[in-house]
Swiss-Prot record:
Residues 227-262 are annotated as: Disordered. Keywords: Cell membrane, Lipoprotein, Membrane, Palmitate, Signal. A lipid is attached at C26 (S-diacylglycerol cysteine). It comes from the Bacteria. GO terms for cellular component: plasma membrane. A lipid is attached at C26 (N-palmitoyl cysteine). It is a lipid-anchor. Residues 237-246 have a biased composition (Basic and acidic residues). This is Probable lipoprotein EnvF. It is found in: Cell membrane. Residues 1-25 form the signal peptide.
């Protein structure tokens, strides 16, 4: 009996040691994970601070004037474009290609440096020849100087204020911000500010060319289920439209046949 008891005690010691080692290892893993999370948070804060510093044109009117001057200097005199965008860290614009007037090219200023020109694929419906494309593009271009961009910092603050007052969405200066002025696919001019919250909800302020407010809305967070339902509704509506057109065509054909019978 004593021999068995002694053996049990001898076994208990290494088991206790192993358990203590495992607990210590788990604690070390937790500490390592906590340290990694802290380092990740610090890294993200540095990135955010850098983006903020490189996006002062969003918050300061004088900095916006510098950005406008920078775009004008890069684009050349009487700059005509089909799109300009301001985003966290920089801005970009798309102009008519100097060497190939039927095509367009993009210039992008990011992290303090210009990139481009880079070719952009442009589809203009109803055009076939290069001359037709060039003419259609000419009609779509608008003068960069015709848009009041200096008002952007003020309008961003107004958008943030309205968004937070709604109680539906919460945004700050550090939220994702995009300002665009462009000719949309339907040929209409669009000038707006979009601020996206962490939950992907968006506050959108639409502006006129002179910088006055044309509209404001809050768009719901992205919901895959709702988006799928919308897509299904569009498909169903398209089917109904096709069926309606088919019936009209059949009715018209029947009228023609009846006329010939007479």
């Amino acid at each position: 009996m004593n021999k068995i008891h002694v053996t049990y005690k001898n076994l208990l010691l290494p088991i206790t040691f192993i358990a203590a080692t495992l607990i210590s290892a788990c604690d070390n893993d937790k500490d390592a994970m906590a340290e990694a999370e802290k380092n990740q948070e610090k890294y993200m804060q540095k990135i955010q601070q850098k983006e903020h510093q490189q996006s002062m044109f969003f918050y300061d009117k004088a900095e916006m004037q510098k950005a406008i001057a920078n775009i004008n200097a890069k684009g050349g005199a009487n700059l005509a474009i089909i799109e300009v965008r301001f985003f966290k860290g920089g801005y970009s614009f798309i102009r008519q290609s100097v060497n190939t007037p039927a095509k367009v090219e993009v210039f992008k200023f990011n992290n303090g440096y210009w990139g481009g020109p880079s070719p952009v694929n442009l589809t203009i419906f109803g055009t076939i020849t290069e001359e037709q494309k060039q003419e259609a593009l000419k009609e779509a271009l608008f003068k960069f100087d015709s848009i009041n961009f200096s008002i952007i910092p003020e309008r961003i603050q107004e958008t943030i204020k309205r968004a937070n007052a709604s109680g539906i969405i919460s945004v700050t200066e550090d939220s994702d911000i995009v300002v665009r002025a462009e000719i949309a696919h339907n040929g209409e001019f669009v000038y707006d500010i979009t601020i996206t919250a962490k939950n992907t909800a968006r506050a959108v302020m639409t502006l006129n060319k002179d910088g006055s407010i044309a509209g404001y809305e809050i768009k719901e967070p992205f919901d895959p289920k709702k988006e799928a339902e919308k897509a299904q509704q569009l498909v169903e509506q398209s089917r109904k439209d096709i069926e309606s057109q088919r019936k009209k065509a059949a009715g018209k054909m029947n009228e023609i046949q009846q006329t010939f019978k007479k």
